[in-house]
Amino acid sequence: MDDAPKLTARQQQILDLVQTSIERTGSPPTRAEIAAELGFRSANAAEEHLQALARKGVIELVGGTSRGIRLKSDTLRSLNQLRNKQFSLPLPSLSQLMLPLVGRVAAGSPILAQEHIDQSYAIEASMFPRRPDYLLKVRGMSMRDAGILDGDLLAVQKAREAKNGQIVVARLGDEVTVKRFRRVRGTIELLPENPDFEPIVVTPESGEFEIEGLAVGLIRNTLLM
């Protein structure tokens, strides 16, 4: 398609890596992770390629966080037309999803109970590497360094299990929280991405604990105004 950006082989490789990281863990890679994966001598080389991708309109770079990389939906729409000619990863189809926005969740009731739904949004599926089931409004800055900020809308796919490193929506007692998941021996740790916050350690004595879903994307709240 004519309006699809022309990328170098290395830029294509980095964009693939960003998509893969978002699909597997719910967040983009850091510059250091990109450098290590692609054999760069320093994170500065990764930053130069990311800046080039941003200039071409493929991604958006968010300052103040090591994982502040956003895939832009209009670019994904154009790249979809190439049917994997540029990218090794399959790109999502161009259908719209009606996603409910979950507000505050009452203790003991399902997260998608009708009383929790503030409203619904029509969102293009091409924005996400995997199909989400709902949006959850982020409250607080505990996941700041993963690029997840207060007021953002987290796209969540329903799930009851998680792998180490994935960003999850978890219910712990009366609270619903967004954290990075890690299982260590007999305990589960819910890790913030902000040094101002302490990890949450889940033990058999912690009370009711349940994984509600996996993060598969993020929408800035201002984009839906």
Swiss-Prot record:
GO function terms (MF aspect): DNA binding; serine-type endopeptidase activity
EC number assigned by the record: 3.4.21.88
InterPro entries in UniProt: LexA (IPR006200), LexA-like (IPR039418), LexA/Signal_pep-like_sf (IPR036286), LexA_DNA-bd_dom (IPR006199), LexA_repressor (IPR050077), Peptidase_S24_LexA (IPR006197), Peptidase_S24_S26A/B/C (IPR015927), WH-like_DNA-bd_sf (IPR036388)
First-level EC class: hydrolase
DNA-binding region range list: 31-51
Keyword line: Autocatalytic cleavage, DNA damage, DNA repair, DNA replication, DNA-binding, Hydrolase, Repressor, SOS response, Transcription, Transcription regulation
Pfam families named among the record's database cross-references: LexA_DNA_bind (PF01726), Peptidase_S24 (PF00717)
SUPFAM superfamilies with a match to the protein in the record: LexA/Signal peptidase, Winged helix' DNA-binding domain
Signal peptide: none
GO biological process: DNA repair; DNA replication; negative regulation of DNA-templated transcription; proteolysis; SOS response
Substrates-to-products reaction catalysed: Hydrolysis of Ala-|-Gly bond in repressor LexA
Catalytic residue list: 142, 179
Marked site: Cleavage: 107-108
Subunit structure: Homodimer.
HAMAP family: LexA
Role this protein plays: Represses a number of genes involved in the response to DNA damage (SOS response), including recA and lexA. In the presence of single-stranded DNA, RecA interacts with LexA causing an autocatalytic cleavage which disrupts the DNA-binding part of LexA, leading to derepression of the SOS regulon and eventually DNA repair.
Family: Belongs to the peptidase S24 family.
Protein name: LexA repressor
Organism: Methylibium petroleiphilum (strain ATCC BAA-1232 / LMG 22953 / PM1)
Gene: lexA
